[in-house]
Amino acid sequence: MDLAVKVKKMGLGHEQGFGAPCLKCKEKCEGFELHFWRKICRNCKCGQEEHDVLLSNEEDRKVGKLFEDTKYTTLIAKLKSDGIPMYKRNVMILTNPVAAKKNVSINTVTYEWAPPVQNQALARHYMQMLPKEKQPVAGSEGAQYRKKQLAKQLPAHDQDPSKCHELSPKEVKEMEQFVKKYKSEALGVGDVKLPREMDAQGPPRIDSPGGDRSTAAAVGAMDGKSAEHRRTQYSCYCCKLSMKEGDPAIYAERAGYDKLWHPACFVCSTCEELLVDMIYFWKNGKLYCGRHYCDSEKPRCAGCDELIFSNEYTQAENQNWHLKHFCCFDCDNILAGEIYVMVDDKPVCKPCYVKNHAVVCQGCHNAIDPEVQRVTYNGFSWHAAAECFLCSCCSKCLLGQKFMPVEGMVFCSVECKKMMS
């Protein structure tokens, strides 16, 4: 790929969703504008998923690329125009007759994603077992939840080097090897089935009492009934509660078909969010979303949100950073060797802190320097100095003294308070 094509590709990435309103900040955001290397809006600092950006095609391309060169190629289709794999997302449309006084109207419900099973009744039952606010009905809170989780759980920059910022050829190669490895060893897609269907597919087995499944019948045909008619109890691998007869369960092939989950329990073991579209990563007996599986394997830069494939990086505030990305969250100046203040877990240089985040002294009405001692009470702050923390009436210094606070003012006595009231 020559330089002109690379620049064009980067430009298109930054044009996507440009100007879209922020669903979180509302009118406070001027519209989405992607930061050059952070995965956030330059105007409001929210992620792209928080903005009203239509990403269905882009998300389908991302998931399609994830399934490329895996056993899940049946879930993708390659476009004839450019050969890019697209996720064949299963959309389910249900029609429910609604009785009226004179005629019957049709109420249509569209799910932006549904488990790819032939039995629509099973898929519908699966959806009903999810919390209502997480059911991906088009135009609903659940559809927005799915959109956010696709962005959060399966970041494009965790699988595609072209979505990362200035990787070296060596880092690109290491990333490609890492992606190939997790596709072959950890990636999977859940199956929705009825537990009794799974028993019918293989020979009956009896597990230990402490396992996920136990049988109430004895081995053999002691009571004259065949093994296939034995009553079997199932428990969820996550919550350990029993599965109800007739309820769908989720199986994960990499975990083994002796384990099963309630639909609402098929969650990442780290963030505990529903695994979006049942896409999971399996490691050491636990389910992970893509993001947290990768976090368990590689350090992630707190600045650009990308995995770190370089041997040289820095650690600060219990987080990892590319050397070039340990920057002020407000102005992007590099912070190596500089004084900084953490604001909402983001490093901010001293000038930006004083300008944008510092609390104002109730005494002198100037910003309080981060290195200066202060007195704070009930949301109000003062410089810890005799000329600032003093009685609002008689100007007596109150450092180390009892005081009476009244709406940002402080008094040394009841008398002074009465004089100012």
Curated annotation (Swiss-Prot):
Cellular component terms (Gene Ontology): cytoplasm; focal adhesion
Keywords, in A-Z order: Cell junction, Cytoplasm, LIM domain, Metal-binding, Repeat, Zinc
Pfam family membership, one: LIM
Transmembrane segments: none
Biased composition (Basic and acidic residues): 155-164
Molecular function via GO: zinc ion binding
Main location group: cytoplasm
Stored InterPro entries: LIM1_Testin (IPR034958), LIM2_Testin (IPR034959), LIM3_Testin (IPR034960), PET_domain (IPR010442), PET_testin (IPR033724), Pk/Esn/Tes (IPR047120), Znf_LIM (IPR001781)
PANTHER family for the chain: LIM DOMAIN-CONTAINING PROTEIN, TESTIN
Name of the protein: Testin
Organism from which the protein derives: Rhinolophus ferrumequinum (Greater horseshoe bat)
